[in-house]
Curated annotation (Swiss-Prot):
Reactions listed under catalytic activity: uridine(34) in tRNA + AH2 + O2 = 5-hydroxyuridine(34) in tRNA + A + H2O
Enzyme Commission number, as recorded: 1.14.-.-
GO process annotations (BP): tRNA modification
Source organism, top-level taxon: Bacteria
SMART domains given in the database record: RHOD
Residues forming the catalytic site: C178
Keyword Oxidoreductase recorded: yes
Native species: Rickettsia peacockii (strain Rustic)
Stored PANTHER family: RHODANESE-LIKE DOMAIN-CONTAINING PROTEIN 7-RELATED, THIOSULFATE SULFURTRANSFERASE/RHODANESE-LIKE DOMAIN-CONTAINING PROTEIN 2
Stated name of the protein: tRNA uridine(34) hydroxylase
Length: 247
């Protein structure tokens, strides 16, 4: 019986002084371990999704952690019958998720995590507003019932939406949500940097929430857009064909 391919997704906001120096080291171990996928490196941290045997993807993750020294690392592993990636790429970027805001220190300055098991109770409180930080075509497929859709085409538009909606956010506990956690985590840092104190985000994002809770209270409506060959998943994480989403 053939071994399943492990697909490891990970990110961490951690200060990396010379991220370019890590590229040859990660390429070396990745190629030796037959890893495919992409790892993005920046001064603000790392963001990667790569595939291989379970043992080998974890060896690459261990090397990445050893080289960067993060306090918190977000990791999720799924499985597939085939590699979803063609080759290994390790790239240097200005940001690991592009927002185009300078001088954000997400590692030290971000909101509080809300665990998936506590999310439903938290977002149904009167003084909490939920903001879906994903792009409009993702929100269109599915979102939380109470979530505000900023109607952004790219994540780079989100800071402008925040500036234009100060009154909406004033005096509220703000709960951020996104697919896997990285965009909502960076969004909380943006809000903290401009003076909002009570800012929160869903740990592990929508996918972790659906896996952990099975949407038992039906606060999630629709499907969840994902950036791979599945295109969208239902609330039990079953894949859905969505050819019209390829835009």
């Amino acid at each position: 019986m053939n071994e399943k391919i492990a697909i490891l997704s990970t990110y961490s906001f951690v200060n990396i002084e010379e991220p370019a120096n890590l590229i040859p080291k990660l390429l070396l171990i990745g190629k030796r371990k037959y890893i495919r996928g992409t790892i993005l490196l920046a001064n603000e941290g790392f963001n990667g999704s790569f595939s291989g045997s379970y043992e080998n993807v974890n060896l690459v993750l261990e090397e990445l952690i050893k080289l960067t020294g993060p306090k918190d690392v977000n990791v999720k592993i799924n499985y597939s019958d085939v590699h979803p990636f063609q080759k290994l790429k390790v790239r240097l970027k200005k940001e690991i998720v592009a927002m185009n805001v300078d001088d954000l220190n997400v590692d030290l300055f971000k909101g509080e995590y809300i665990e998936p098991k506590d999310w439903d109770e938290f977002i149904t409180k009167q003084d909490v507003i939920v903001i879906d930080t994903r792009n409009d075509y993702e929100v269109e497929v599915g979102t939380f019932k109470s979530a505000i859709n900023p109607n952004t085409k790219t994540f780079k538009q989100f800071p402008a939406w925040v500036q234009q909606n100060q009154e909406l956010l004033k005096g509220k506990k703000i709960a951020m949500v996104c697919t896997g956690g990285i965009r909502c985590e960076k969004s909380t840092s943006l809000l903290k940097s401009i003076g909002y104190d009570e800012v929160y985000h869903l740990k592990g994002g929508i996918l972790q929430y659906l896996e952990d809770t099975q949407n038992k209270n039906n606060l999630w409506q629709g499907e969840c857009f994902v950036f791979d060959d599945r295109r969208a998943v239902t609330d039990d994480l079953s894949p859905v064909e969505r050819h019209w989403l390829q835009r």
